[in-house]
Amino acid sequence: MTTDGGGWLLVMNVITGSSHYNQLSLMTSYRGISDYHSNKMVISTSAMKELYGDLNFQQIRFHCRKHSVGRTFHVVTAANSSGNAVVQYFSGLTDVEPVSCGSYVRMEDDNSELARRCSEWNYGQAGKWSRTGKGWKNTVQRLYNHAAWIYGQYHWDLVDRNSFECDDMSASPSSGDFWKVFVR
């Protein structure tokens, strides 16, 4: 992948329109990411930790687009301590939810509300990545269950509602909508 200088490894890939795309295939070892062509592959936090141990990646890139919404969320963790905190969190090396503002760089095609309004992320506009709350499987689902979200408005979510969310809340899906995560 040549985005932002290249070197990206695809670790999560969900594309609507493929058969049974809403029946996600959870990879509990990073070795399962070779199944990316199924277009319904998500990766667990423990698999990210395993991958980090072997690859020591320094950045994570989040990219989703939902055609009915007309917006794209496309950010890369920043090459600074705030961006590193995001990498550490999504790799399961810490349980401290990282601050969102200053932790990422918006890519050229990003026109999302989420990326524009980082101080409003999480419950109570805490301005943090991820999701807190009871009943949430934070040890498994960090990358695909509310990785970034503004309560009741704009979400990155492949768990809570059947119409997966990308910078929206419950908008209708279209064939070709996608959610991808890369590391390098």
Per-range role (PLM):
Residues 1-184:
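Mature extracellular or lumenal effector domains of secreted proteins
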